[in-house]
Amino acid sequence: MVRNVVVIGTQWGDEGKGKIVDWLTDRAAGVIRFQGGHNAGHTLVVNGEKTVLHLIPSGILRKDVICYIGNGVVLSPGALLDEMSMLEQAGVDVSGRLRISEACPLILPYHIAVDGARELAKGPEKIGTTGRGIGPAYEDKIARRAIRLQDLFYPERFASKLKEVLDYHNFLLKNYYHTATVDYDQILDECLKKAERIQPMVADVPKLLFEANKAGNNLLFEGAQGALLDIDHGTYPFVTSSNCIAGAASVGSGVGPQLLGYVLGITKAYTTRVGSGPFPTELADTTGEYLAQRGNEFGSTTGRPRRCGWFDAVATRRSIQINGVSGLCITKLDVLDGLEKLKICTGYKSKQSDRLYDALPFGADDLADIEPVYEELPGWQACTAGIKDFDQLPKTAQNYLKRIEEVCQTPISMISTGPDRIETIVFHHPFG
């Protein structure tokens, strides 16, 4: 029986999706990226070898898996070719196994220029973007002025569209942000040179995915960022520029929603966030530092330190609801080793009144008024790193995980106890 799986992050990204996607690909024929761009940072460790992918699907390290980049992804030609070169130098066949939708909007140098100028102008109020042009590229898409991948293979069409959209962005850069403009000829020459390498990988992705599913092949949809960064459902305006929830897998790949099956929600055993925005359970103390150091909490895309805090069951429940999560995968359990006490946020209360919340408020303004209500549990001193059998975990670790299941009202399907694909405990395989 064919079973397609959608993998999404239930927090603010950085939950460990890359490792889990890589692990799941032993039963998948295809892996699909359906949103975001090269602002994603998916870290994979195979036999001790670390690989960080930003754009190419994590299934690329399995030699028999076909990888797809769907229309929902904003594509940087330069980032794509750089990542391909990195993988090919390591002996990975990329061009023969990568299919890219011709409908992908392109990220070009003027998007990066606008992104940087905007963040600089906002000063302390900045969103904390990766600075890679993701937001401005999505803006062009919605405004119907985007240059898409298919345009790149028609030089006259591309040149005409580039001039029109660059005039718009250069006017903005010069007259609103009072910063340097971007050179037309340089972009034109660079893009046309890159087109030749990219063109053989361009394909009708919706058609290929439909045919793969019809042939009985399992498909794995790889989400980027996390549900709490979703443009509609996240902590707006401190969000990313795309829909990060499971439903976006359909829109961003061209696969009908009836073909999506199991939704696996990746969730850290604690909580982290990169950049600005509300974070109810954040720990600005030695415990937060402990989590950051043990968890090596630095962004794989930007290198920025991640903010760390206790597990937030209220926020996770919101993600479970909006994604239709079938089961959870708890990652980085081993980071909690050595802590005497642990806390789980089971509710919020208003700072101004006695009002209690059992659901995540929408938007950053409402979140600024709340503080967490905690339930305390005993920690454990034993090492859980690399354990592959639930019964071998300390009893207090087992109880912690069971309590997460109870307060999130969702079963745990998998537990990750280390970065390598083999360091995994499995209760229920998402592919059945």
UniProtKB/Swiss-Prot annotation:
GTP binds at residues 13-19, 41-43, 306, 332-334, 416-418. Coiled coil: none annotated. Pathway: Purine metabolism; AMP biosynthesis via de novo pathway; AMP from IMP: step 1/2. Pfam families: Adenylsucc_synt. The keyword Nucleotide-binding applies. The active site is at residues 14, 42. Its main location: cytoplasm. Mg(2+) binds at residues 14, 41. Its cofactor is Mg(2+). This is Adenylosuccinate synthetase.
